[in-house]
């Protein structure tokens, strides 16, 4: 079985926070969680929550850019 410490490097690979919740449920049921383990899980969830947080449309300069040349037709 994978330990929680082994999951930390894969926090971005895990993806959406819903996946993290599933992993948390896996470990809560089968292993006693220490304080260090809880901090590690909290850190993984925070990383992914920030990654998937909705962004403001004003923060993306590419959306506000006016195209100067027409797009080329696909070949």
UniProtKB/Swiss-Prot annotation:
It is a single-pass membrane protein. This is ORF2p protein. Residues 53-75 are annotated as: Disordered. The keyword Membrane applies. It is found in: Host cytoplasmic vesicle membrane. It comes from the Viruses. Facilitates virus release from intestinal cells in vitro, possibly through the host autophagic pathway. The chain crosses the membrane at residues 23-45. GO terms for cellular component: host cell cytoplasmic vesicle membrane; membrane. Changing residue 29 to A: Decreased virus yield. Keywords: Host cytoplasmic vesicle, Host membrane, Membrane, Transmembrane, Transmembrane helix. Its main location: host cell. It comes from Human enterovirus 71 (strain USA/BrCr/1970). Changing residue 25 to A: Decreased virus yield. Residues 13-18 are annotated as: Important for viral replication in intestinal cells. Signal peptide: none annotated.
């Amino acid at each position: 079985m994978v330990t929680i410490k082994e999951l930390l490097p894969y926090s971005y690979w895990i993806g959406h926070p819903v996946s993290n919740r599933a992993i948390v449920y896996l470990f809560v049921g089968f292993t006693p969680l220490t304080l260090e383990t809880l901090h590690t899980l909290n850190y993984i969830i925070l990383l992914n929550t920030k990654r998937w947080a909705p962004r403001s449309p004003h923060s993306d300069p590419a959306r506000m850019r006016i195209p100067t040349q027409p797009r080329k037709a696909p070949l």
